[in-house]
A protein has these predicted regions:
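Sec-dependent signal peptide recognition
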Residues: 2-9
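N-terminal maturation segment of proteins
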Residues: 19-591
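C-terminal motif of bacterial Sec signal peptides marking the signal peptidase cleavage site
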Residues: 15-16
């Protein structure tokens, strides 16, 4: 006992004598321990999160009530430990780690409390689509890789049953997607129900196997794959299709507002503040949206005047929506045009960025099974280091995919938008592993919208129609602030929201419908684009005013992107710190 007492006294003495620097090291180490525990949790929370090979490659996530509760309790402990860290004494790198991890874990806890797992679907997609991408999770190089994959196919019935269990809980508790956004949703399920199993997405790994496999092994694996798809995959999708049509859609809620859900007002405010990363109110977001709509409308009207168009704003928009000159005549033509724009921007990147990613990207079609209800385009990052990223372009209904918005779309989704930003984050060195894969919507989508604006400085939008298309896309994001808050918190109907979006943009009416349904089914996410872009532009303006002729745009962009995704408040702290340090350097250079 005396030895223990002496040891404690010595420990207290050492702690009391610690310098501020050593205290920072101690606090940083404390945070490192929390991060290590979180990473261990994350690696074991889902078999998709592990880097190691073994039994987990043959598993699917366990969505049982007991497992989800255990995950929640484990996260809660980690979050409590994280909250005890003295953020004011952290180094900047560790402060970023703390901010990103706090934001991430809080959302995971909130999602469990708000029963987000009761609704594993949106208007445009769902778990049945997400799980179909398991063939991209691993490299198929060994026989064991294929056998693990076959084991995952055998686990699909349980996985689908667990998802439907939670959806039934949602029905019982009034937590479902609105009925209106589910019209035609069953078609995305039916697309996976194949008569010829060799045409199934799940069969793709067996279509081209390693050349070093013997023919007998290839034949054996193909036979087993066909049997597994017939026995496990197709019946799972058929069961889900029947459930969707016979049970879920008829039982879905009629009210579109998130505020109509149990504890709905608090839930929507939670989603709003999560997706904007800001302590902001519904009313403030709505008013910012209205102000942005009015400002952008003036710029759009100026272009119509410059073109000497005889007619109203509505007439001009109708002209854009219906004139064949603005639409590609083939899927290949649309993809080629998108590819040309992307390559053209590639050549401009060194003018705007000091640091560029190594990861390449391709331009491909949105998969046909989800295209009808899917958004215009999207970026899909690689899931392995032997893959490229992909800029998805929706070629469904070409008469609804105007070319005048393609420059803005491409810059947003490919470069300098999501591909560049996401690849730099994945390629970051000397950061905790979770940072490489963290995506914070306000940061990422804000950067995407800002990237559309960079096209002006890069010499894009030379045609007044494409410039109007750029403004249409900016107006689209401004309208989101209005319609998302309007529908989920202010009693707006779906029709009112559709009319507002249609009246203020040149989006096709098909896109207007799919977009509004997306916002209904994904409360708050649509707010991240404009709120993030406004923050990045505000910070750029602040740096330009502070540094004057010493402002370096390439350096500013590197400062924004070099640390990956983060809450906007943390980004502001970093940029302010950069300016202060830059001023010190400039002052020293003058002496």
């Amino acid at each position: 006992m005396k030895v223990f007492s002496v040891a404690v006294c010595v420990l207290f003495f050492i702690m009391a004598c610690q310098s501020p620097h050593s205290q920072v090291l101690s606090i940083n180490h404390e945070l490192e321990l929390v991060i290590a525990d979180y990473q261990y949790y994350k690696d074991h929370q889902s078999p998709f999160n592990r880097d190691i090979s073994g039994d987990t490659n043959a598993q699917l996530p366990d969505l049982s009530p007991s497992n989800l509760e255990q995950q929640y309790l484990a996260l809660k402990v980690i979050y409590q430990r994280l909250a005890q860290v003295d953020v004011g004494k952290l180094s900047q790198d560790e402060a970023i780690n703390h901010a990103v991890l706090s934001y991430t874990i809080k959302n995971q806890l909130d999602n469990y409390i708000n029963h987000e797992h009761y609704m594993p679907l949106t208007a445009e997609s769902g778990f049945h689509v997400w799980i179909s991408r398991i063939n991209g999770q691993v490299s198929f190089k060994t026989e064991q890789d294929y056998r693990d994959y076959l084991a995952r196919l055998a686990a699909l019935p349980k996985y689908f049953s667990q998802q439907m269990f939670w959806m039934n809980k949602g029905i019982d508790e009034g937590i479902t997607q609105p009925k209106i956004v589910l019209q035609g949703f069953e078609d995305s399920i039916k697309a996976f129900i194949k008569t010829d199993v060799t045409t199934s997405t799940y069969y793709q790994p067996f279509s081209k196997m390693p050349a070093y496999f013997s023919e007998s092994l290839k034949s054996q694996l193909k036979t087993q794959a066909a049997a597994s798809i017939s026995e496990f995959v197709i019946p799972s999708y058929q069961k889900y299709y029947d459930y969707m049509v016979q049970r879920y859609q008829p039982s879905a809620r009629d009210n579109i507002a998130a505020s109509s859900l149990p504890n709905g007002e608090a839930y929507y405010l939670n989603r709003l503040q999560y997706y904007t990363t800001l302590p902001i109110s519904v009313d403030d977001v709505h008013e910012i949206g209205l102000a942005e709509v009015a400002r952008i409308r003036l710029e759009m009207d100026d272009i119509i005047t410059q073109l000497a168009f005889a007619g109203s704003f509505a007439d001009f928009v109708n002209f854009l929506r219906t004139d064949k000159q603005f639409y590609a005549t083939s899927s290949e033509g649309l993809l080629k045009e998108a590819s040309f724009i992307a390559k053209k921007m590639d050549a401009q990147l060194p003018k705007f960025f000091k640091t560029l990613p190594r990861t390449p990207y391709g331009v491909i079609e949105v998969p046909a099974n989800i295209a009808p209800k899917y958004t215009t385009g999207r970026y899909s990052g690689p899931s392995r280091d032997d893959q490229a990223g992909n800029y998805w372009v929706n070629t469904y209904r070409l008469d609804r995919r105007p070319l005048y918005v393609l420059e803005a779309l491409t810059l947003h989704e490919a470069v300098p938008g999501h591909h560049l930003q996401g690849s730099l984050a994945r390629e970051m060195k000397n950061v905790p592993k979770f940072r490489n894969s963290t995506y914070i919507s306000a940061f990422g989508e804000g950067w995407g919208l800002y990237s559309e604006y960079l096209g002006v400085e890069a010499g894009f939008y030379q045609s007044p129609y494409s410039d109007f298309g750029r403004l249409t896309y900016e107006m689209w994001r401004a309208c989101r602030l209005v319609v998302d808050t309007g529908m989920h918190a202010k009693g707006w109907s779906r029709e009112r929201a559709m009319n507002f979006l249609a009246d203020n943009t040149a989006l096709s009416l098909h896109n207007v419908k799919t977009e509004i349904d997306r916002y209904i089914s994904w409360p708050g996410q649509a707010l991240s684009y404009k709120m993030g872009e406004l923050t990045i532009k505000k910070l750029r303006n602040m740096v330009e005013l502070s540094l004057g002729e010493n402002f370096d745009l390439r350096e500013f962009h590197d400062q924004v992107l070099k640390n990956g995704s983060m809450p906007l408040s943390m980004l502001e702290t970093i940029i302010i710190d950069y300016v202060e340090k830059k001023k010190v350097v400039l002052k020293e250079e003058k002496q």
